[in-house]
Amino acid sequence: MAVKKGSLVRIVPEKFENSVEAKASDRRLPPYVFEGTGEVLEIKGDYAQIQFRVPVPTVWLRVDQLEAA
């Protein structure tokens, strides 16, 4: 299933590890990043803006690092 605006998604850890996005982030990511779901707020090119179900800022991740929840 393609990722689109409003979709609930999960991060695929195997695709996220060693990516540019992972290297630019703190190595101690909180559990909700991999255990919970997030909602796609916007898509621009190869990136999707994700809002997790906790009160934290949104993040931009590559669409190929996400899977439908």
UniProtKB/Swiss-Prot annotation:
Function according to Swiss-Prot or TrEMBL: NDH-1 shuttles electrons from an unknown electron donor, via FMN and iron-sulfur (Fe-S) centers, to quinones in the respiratory and/or the photosynthetic chain. The immediate electron acceptor for the enzyme in this species is believed to be plastoquinone. Couples the redox reaction to proton translocation, and thus conserves the redox energy in a proton gradient. Cyanobacterial NDH-1 also plays a role in inorganic carbon-concentration.
Top-level taxon in the UniProt lineage: Bacteria
Keywords, in A-Z order: Membrane, NAD, NADP, Plastoquinone, Quinone, Thylakoid, Translocase, Transport
HAMAP family named among the record's database cross-references: NDH1_NDH1O (MF_01354)
Keyword field contains Disulfide bond: no
Pfam families: NdhO
Known catalytic reactions: a plastoquinone + NADH + (n+1) H(+)(in) = a plastoquinol + NAD(+) + n H(+)(out); a plastoquinone + NADPH + (n+1) H(+)(in) = a plastoquinol + NADP(+) + n H(+)(out)
Family (UniProt): Belongs to the complex I NdhO subunit family.
Cell compartments where the protein resides: Cellular thylakoid membrane
This protein's name: NAD(P)H-quinone oxidoreductase subunit O
Subunit structure: NDH-1 can be composed of about 15 different subunits; different subcomplexes with different compositions have been identified which probably have different functions.
Keyword Transport recorded: yes
Organism of this sequence: Acaryochloris marina (strain MBIC 11017)
UniProt-listed InterPro entries: NdhO (IPR020905)
Topology of the protein relative to the lipid bilayer: Peripheral membrane protein
Main location: membrane
E.C. numbers: 7.1.1.-
GO cellular component: plasma membrane-derived thylakoid membrane
GO MF annotation list: oxidoreductase activity, acting on NAD(P)H, quinone or similar compound as acceptor; quinone binding
